[in-house]
Amino acid sequence: MKSAASSRGGGGGGRGGGGWGSWGGGRGGGGGAGKGGGGDGGGQGGKGGFGARARGFGGGGRGRGRGGGDGKDRGGGGQRRGGVAKSKSRRRKGAMVVSVEPHRHEGVFIYRGAEDALVTLNMVPGQSVYGERRVTVTEGGVKQEYRTWNPFRSKLAAAILGGVDQIHIKPKSKVLYLGAASGTTVSHVSDIIGPDGLVYAVEFSHRAGRDLVNVAKKRTNIIPVLEDARHPLKYRMLIGMVDVIFADVAQPDQSRIVALNAHTFLRNGGHFLISIKANCIDSTASAEAVFASEVRKLQQENLKPQEQLTLEPYERDHAVVVGVYRPLPKSSSK
């Protein structure tokens, strides 16, 4: 009885030394013998604080070994944790400088921040169209909101980042967009042309057309047209002459579709951009052969291609052809 009492009572003062105090940064120094250390070896040692959990149980005199070393190790770890938190605090203090720079294409911008991104000035601040990220930048004391433009979801954005020389879409332009789908790219065209421009968005799918109409409800410069782009005369009464045609219809006869709409709506000297998906036209031929064939078809319709650009790495076997529409002058009859 005497021996047991001595064992349990001898180490009672060691608890504050190595265990509990060490979690907060090693204040206890790790030198304590633990809850039950320091007796005559008659009783089992107690817990030595948080650090003791990884140690095994031993025989007589075990209280000292269990309580001593582990509390010290854990205390050291507490100091290391404090170091990490301090480093993070220093990083938070240095605020990141963000800015927006105009792109060489008028109405398009480059966001400089943690990650650079292509952006357009949001025509409807506070509203996203397809879940894109919005960023706010203060310029001259005025807050401006921009929408990031994902090149993996937009052929036009992919062409811009790919280095296309001209897109011919700028503020106040009138644009005919064939194959508008749910309005992802159309919404960015809406941002570019601004409130003084117009984009006529033609889409045949009624399911995508519903989304397009919802986008147009908040953007007054979008006019949705739910019709087949193969029959431009069906919507002739809705659309005036335009400056630019952008086509993303992904159909085997897309060159003919562009030509029909150009003859009906595109002004002389107007421009066109057509996104060509090689597999949709001829899956047996190489992409280069398909692109060359489509260019020849455009030339036969008085659509003069000026530039051709592939869309890798954003799209596979895709190309954008940019050109000008110049119909042959009418011969005077005598």
From Swiss-Prot:
Region (Disordered): 1-97
Species of the source: Homo sapiens
PANTHER family cross-referenced by the UniProt entry: RRNA 2-O-METHYLTRANSFERASE FIBRILLARIN, RRNA_TRNA 2'-O-METHYLTRANSFERASE FIBRILLARIN-LIKE PROTEIN 1
Known catalytic reactions: a ribonucleotide in RNA + S-adenosyl-L-methionine = a 2'-O-methylribonucleotide in RNA + S-adenosyl-L-homocysteine + H(+)
Keywords from the UniProt entry: Methylation, Methyltransferase, Nucleus, Ribonucleoprotein, RNA-binding, rRNA processing, S-adenosyl-L-methionine, Transferase
Coiled coil start-end: none
InterPro entries: Fibrillarin, Fibrillarin_CS, SAM-dependent_MTases_sf
Principal location listed in the UniProt entry: nucleus
Modified residues (Asymmetric dimethylarginine): 8, 27
Protein task: S-adenosyl-L-methionine-dependent RNA methyltransferase that catalyzes 2'-hydroxyl ribose methylation in RNAs. Functions as part of box C/D small nucleolar ribonucleoprotein (snoRNP) complexes, where guide snoRNAs ensure methylation specificity through base pairing with RNA substrates. Exhibits broad substrate specificity, methylating multiple sites on ribosomal RNAs (rRNAs) and messenger RNAs (mRNAs) depending on the guide snoRNA incorporated in the complex.
Gene3D superfamilies from the UniProt entry: Phosphorylase Kinase, domain 1, Vaccinia Virus protein VP39
Class of enzymatic activity (EC top level): transferase
The protein's name: RNA 2'-O-methyltransferase FBLL1
Family: Belongs to the methyltransferase superfamily. Fibrillarin family.
Subunit structure: Component of a box C/D small nucleolar ribonucleoprotein (snoRNP) complex composed of FBLL1, SNU13/NHP2L1, NOP56 and NOP58 and a guide snoRNA which mediates 2'-hydroxyl ribose methylation in RNAs.
Positions where Omega-N-methylarginine occurs in the chain: 15
